[in-house]
A protein has these predicted regions:
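Short Pro/Gly-enriched beta-strand edge/turn motifs at strand-loop
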Residues: 103-112, 165-174, 257-258
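Active-site rim segments in enzyme catalytic domains, especially the processed small/beta chain
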Residues: 132-197, 221, 225
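Extended C-terminal subregions enriched in glycine
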Residues: 58, 130, 178, 211, ...
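Short, small/polar residue-rich loop motifs at catalytic or cofactor-binding pockets
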Residues: 118-121, 182-184, 271
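Extended C-terminal regions of large enzymes
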Residues: 27-30, 35, 189-205, 218
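Short Gly/Pro-enriched turn/cap motifs at secondary-structure boundaries
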Residues: 28-31, 113-117, 175-181, 263-267
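Internal maturation/activation junctions in enzymes
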Residues: 47-140, 152-153, 160, 266
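Single conserved hydrophobic/aromatic residue that forms the stacking wall/gate
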Residues: 1-12
């Protein structure tokens, strides 16, 4: 039996980062999946996304996501127990090799991730008049989490132990005192050591893809935060390419022709919030996803 009293101290680790389109993207380190979002951005940077058709952008993101999530499920775990090769995954040579594995005209099959799904995440972003910013995300994984709460305050404990693996030799294997791989990743942007703004995406496993899609919409396609959040979404997950209804049946047919198994989910894909500082005038521009409760407001 592992003594729970040993877990009363929080673990504070340095953020990880990568550059994308002139901005520095800051993400949560392992045992979080922030490196998955950074890897996706590093791969997408190798494509001229501005000139690609909608079909090709959806396809490239789907193929990059399948590979990035496969690498996530292979390597990510609590670094206190198993070293996680963050620098190796994000190195130019490795990223070039990963991109070379992406076919531009054919869907590649990967074993579907067996990471458990969970939709119950809340995200908020705030920036004050002094330029201090908060990017906050919270989730207890399931309804009422583990079902266990603190007797003094009624705070529920999460049930993220579901994300452990049962293979004894896997980096994310279940073990006492160990933190499981998790999906919740609040993001932050800077440029030339100045704050650009906080951003985040809800939606369980979608979050890493959501980060990449949100930033690509803004920095490749020139959208403002609200437009970038409103834009139609796709997500290659569990062997299926999910498309929101707004993509339409014609696009689904085109992508099916590339070998994707396409599905229109019954509910929207994810949600998000973002606050971005306009570099030209310093004005803060916010966006709030209409797929979820929330709104953008100034004070």
């Amino acid at each position: 039996h592992y003594p729970l009293r040993r877990q009363r101290q929080m673990c504070i680790r340095d953020s990880i980062r990568a550059d994308y389109r002139g901005h520095t993207v800051w993400e949560c380190p392992p045992n979080g999946q922030g490196v998955t979002a950074l890897l996706l951005l590093r791969m997408m940077e190798r494509f001229d996304l501005e000139t690609l058709s909608d079909r090709d952008r959806i396809h490239v993101l789907a193929e990059a996501a399948k590979l990035a999530y496969h690498l996530r499920d292979t390597y990510l775990a609590d670094p206190s127990f198993s070293p996680v090769p963050v620098e190796w995954l994000l190195a130019d040579e490795q990223v070039d090799g990963f991109v070379a594995m992406i076919s531009r005209d054919k869907a590649t099959e990967y074993a579907p991730s067996d990471f458990p799904d969970h939709p119950h995440t809340v995200y908020l972003a705030a920036v004050d008049e002094d330029g201090m910013a908060v990017s906050l995300i919270n989730s207890i994984f399931d309804d009422f989490g583990s079902g266990i709460s603190t007797p003094e305050y009624g705070v529920l404990f999460h049930s993220r132990g579901k994300a452990f693996r049962l293979e004894a030799d896997h980096p994310n294997a279940i073990e006492g005192g160990k933190r499981p791989l998790h999906t919740i990743i609040p993001g932050m942007l800077s440029q030339d050591d100045r704050l650009v703004g906080p951003f985040g995406v809800m939606g369980g496993q979608y979050q890493a893809v959501g980060h990449a899609m949100l930033l690509s919409n803004m920095f490749n396609l020139g959208m403002n935060p609200q437009q970038a959040l409103d834009a139609p979404r796709s997500f290659a997950h569990a062997g299926v390419l999910q498309l929101e209804d707004s993509h339409g049946a014609e696009m689904a047919g085109i992508l099916s022709g590339l070998g994707h198994e396409v599905d229109f989910p019954s509910s929207p894909i994810g949600g998000g919030q973002a606050i971005i500082r306009d570099a030209a005038n310093g004005v803060l521009v916010a966006g709030s996803d209409p797929r979820k409760d929330g709104h953008a407001s100034g004070y």
